């Protein structure tokens, strides 16, 4: 999640129609954790790499990147920084000169131990709403959402949430490959299909995202011919959004992918695991989300912000 993505989330409400989905709850918890971050994404990736190398040398930089869910280009930059600080050693693989063997140095072990304490303290703070037993259970359930080969490499609740969130998002989007759609399109399309016409501001409130974020989202749907943006006949200062016939057709495609993803998640978590994880994630969100979003986004509300569509800034929702 980038900085522009994280500011798309609005603490305070949760859309009831989306809270059944583990992937959605993970996204909100990940956004909540990211919003209170002390460091940067690069700090998180560096810790993951150091922790992975603590148990063994790694014979393929590319393989480690894939196991940790880190883009290969970003992985090169992470290793460059760690190597420059003397925390990681990168040497040619004698069995394959095209690959590098990654090793943790003594300095790297010291840096890892120092970070472990900080990570543990941060996890305690982020999961303060849970008992120690609940947090242990949360970590175990989150690990089930990761590939078996990755599970031993990712430690700490914050990192498990991030990895599970990214994996489910990719898994869902892979189901829509070739359609031009993303799992994130389900929320706005399903809301607009139910409540139409709908003002742009009301859609933002219903989805609990910022105005700039919903503008970017709607722009994307309008460009694809899935949503029509017109003026509200009752208030010319506002936009009235409607799903097109093509949008309804594509909503069916996205809905099937979302259902398939939910079934996959249920299988990964095992009997009772889905309800248990949903409850634990809900507890983490309870402190910052006071209640459900409005059930009808079509209710009229004043909106000065929508009167100047050209002033929007881009803030993608993932």
Give the ranges of each region predicted by the language model.
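N-terminal leader segment of winged-helix/HTH proteins
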Residues: 1-40, 128, 132-179, 303-307, ...
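Alpha-helical structural segments
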Residues: 24, 28, 32, 54-55, ...
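N-terminal helix-turn-helix DNA-binding core of bacterial DNA-binding proteins
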Residues: 24-27, 31-74, 79, 85, ...
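Residues in the helix-turn-helix
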Residues: 74, 99, 213
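Charged, amphipathic alpha-helical coiled-coil/dimerization segments
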Residues: 81-136, 217-279
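Intrinsic, low-complexity N-terminal interaction/targeting segments
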Residues: 183, 205, 210-212, 216, ...
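Ser/Thr/Pro-rich low-complexity tandem-repeat tracts
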Residues: 290, 295-303, 310
């Amino acid at each position: 999640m980038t900085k522009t993505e994280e500011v798309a989330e609005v603490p305070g409400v949760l859309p009831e129609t989306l809270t059944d989905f583990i992937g959605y709850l993970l996204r909100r918890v990940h956004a909540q954790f990211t919003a209170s971050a002390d460091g940067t994404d690069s700090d998180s990736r560096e810790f993951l790499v150091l922790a992975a190398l603590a148990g063994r040398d790694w014979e393929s930089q590319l393989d480690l990147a894939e196991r940790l869910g880190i883009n290969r280009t970003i992985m090169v930059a992470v290793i460059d920084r760690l190597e420059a600080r003397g925390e990681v050693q990168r040497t040619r693989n004698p069995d394959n000169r095209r690959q590098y063997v990654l090793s943790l140095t003594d300095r790297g072990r010291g840096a890892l131990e120092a970070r472990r304490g900080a990570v543990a303290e941060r996890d305690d703070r982020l999961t303060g709403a849970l008992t120690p037993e609940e947090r242990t259970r949360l970590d175990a359930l989150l690990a089930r959402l990761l590939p078996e080969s990755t599970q031993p490499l990712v430690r700490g609740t914050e990192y498990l949430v991030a990895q599970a969130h990214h994996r489910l998002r990719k898994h869902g989007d892979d189901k829509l490959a070739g359609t031009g759609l993303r799992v994130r399109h389900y929320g706005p399309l399903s809301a607009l299909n139910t409540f139409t016409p709908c003002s742009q501001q009301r859609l933002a409130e219903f989805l609990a995202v910022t105005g700039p974020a919903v503008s970017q989202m709607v722009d994307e749907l309008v460009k694809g011919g899935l949503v029509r943006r017109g003026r509200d006949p009752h208030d010319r200062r506002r936009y009235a959004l409607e799903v097109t016939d093509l949008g309804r057709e594509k909503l069916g495609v996205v809905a099937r992918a979302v259902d398939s993803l939910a079934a996959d998640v249920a299988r990964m978590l095992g009997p009772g695991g889905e309800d248990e994880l949903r409850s634990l994630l809900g507890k983490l969100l309870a402190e910052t989300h006071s209640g459900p979003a409005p059930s009808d986004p079509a209710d009229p509300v004043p909106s000065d912000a929508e009167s100047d569509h050209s002033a929007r800034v881009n803030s993608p929702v993932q």
